């Protein structure tokens, strides 16, 4: 079970601890908060149908004191441009400077596939030597033909073996994801 620790709007207010962290990032509305709730088996993270609701860095801990971080989504958000720029700077600062960060979990909506922004992020993470896990979310929304099309597109990008297909709603592959994340904390 995950427990909410705190929200942070800048590096001075980050959660101060000596453990490693796993962060969750992706475009707005891909299901980051829903996934955290699914991992927790409780509604520990606020969920919204409106893109861009998560605007702070949210820190959570599990019973073993492992730290999970929910980052705001990139892409669409309903906020003034200067506030959006400040939020993106906050995310960049966390990703580039956070010493506790061990693994980045990049979520993308399986209905949309991996978009250019996602590919840019994957390339940045690889160049920065960041450990990255890719999750295709909302897999329950796809029929068999759409799943096949997604897998073909992932194969074309050479990513078919490194993407886990998940559904927070149906809990598809959530237990496999928990095992994968547990191994990252070791």
Curated annotation (Swiss-Prot):
Single GO biological process annotation from the record: division septum assembly
- Kindly list the positions annotated as binding GTP: 26-33, 52-56, 70-73, 137-140, 166-168
**What are the names of the required cofactors?**
Mg(2+)
- Key words of the record: Cell cycle, Cell division, GTP-binding, Magnesium, Metal-binding, Nucleotide-binding, Septation
GO molecular function terms noted in the UniProt entry: GTP binding; metal ion binding
Q: Which GO terms describe its cellular component?
A: cytosol
What residue stretches are annotated with the EngB-type G domain?
Answer: 18-186
Tell me the protein family, please: Belongs to the TRAFAC class TrmE-Era-EngA-EngB-Septin-like GTPase superfamily. EngB GTPase family.
The source organism is Mycoplasmopsis pulmonis (strain UAB CTIP)
Asked if the keyword GTP-binding belongs to this entry, the reply reads yes
Q: What is this protein called?
A: Probable GTP-binding protein EngB
Q: Which Pfam families match?
A: MMR_HSR1
Q: Which residues bind Mg(2+)?
A: 33, 54
Q: What does this protein do?
A: Necessary for normal cell division and for the maintenance of normal septation.
Origin superkingdom: Bacteria
